């Protein structure tokens, strides 16, 4: 961990940290290392799941993000994913979890199904982004959007996650009708307005 932290600190950029935007909780410590650089450094490390879990528990932005790349995706499943879910406290962590870890897991569909029921906005967001990136979508996941929107009617990240998941599902002809019917049954709210606007042009092509 010390070596990895040293590499991150060499790339420290206070201006980037100050300008950084994400939804959710702030980090305990943020060196302001750009996300592409965090990924580049993390990918020089071999998979070490125990180390990744340790890094993810640290209150340092760059170590948390790197942990998603160092973890072994074959070792995460619905029954042991709580450590990761509990540590996802903002939109940046949710997006990187989906991109770097969840979508590569053989158990991604089971994890997505579990996380969509979470009481954490960010865990739900991560699940939807993982579903979109890995095509881990079934009718159940699509229809869950109705409940999710009712729980988070004013959340822009949740609305964006819904669009990502619905748009990915709509590419499959088998799911097009259920996507349309799901959108039609959403309660009127800010999240629904965003979803309908974004999906309207996507469903035209």
What are these regions (language model features)?
Residues 1-205:
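Alpha-helical scaffold domains
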């Amino acid at each position: 961990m010390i070596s990895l932290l040293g590499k991150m600190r060499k790339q420290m950029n206070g201006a980037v940290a100050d300008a950084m935007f994400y939804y959710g909780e702030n980090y305990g410590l943020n060196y302001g290392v750009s996300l592409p650089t965090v990924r580049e450094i993390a990918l020089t490390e071999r998979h070490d799941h125990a180390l990744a879990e340790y890094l993810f528990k640290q209150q340092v932005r760059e170590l948390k993000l790197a942990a998603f790349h160092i973890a072994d995706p074959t070792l995460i499943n619905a029954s042991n994913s709580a450590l990761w879910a509990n540590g996802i406290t903002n939109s940046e962590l949710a997006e990187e979890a989906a991109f770097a870890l969840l979508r590569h897991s053989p158990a991604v569909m089971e994890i997505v199904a579990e996380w969509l029921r979470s009481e954490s906005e960010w865990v739900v967001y991560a699940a939807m982004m993982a579903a979109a990136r890995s095509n881990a979508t079934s009718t159940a996941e699509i229809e869950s959007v109705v409940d999710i929107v009712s729980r988070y009617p004013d959340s822009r990240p949740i609305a964006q996650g819904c669009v990502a998941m619905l748009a990915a599902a709509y590419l499959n002809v088998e799911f097009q009708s259920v996507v349309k019917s799901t959108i039609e049954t959403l309660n009127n709210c800010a999240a629904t307005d965003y979803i309908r606007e974004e999906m309207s042009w996507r469903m035209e092509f």
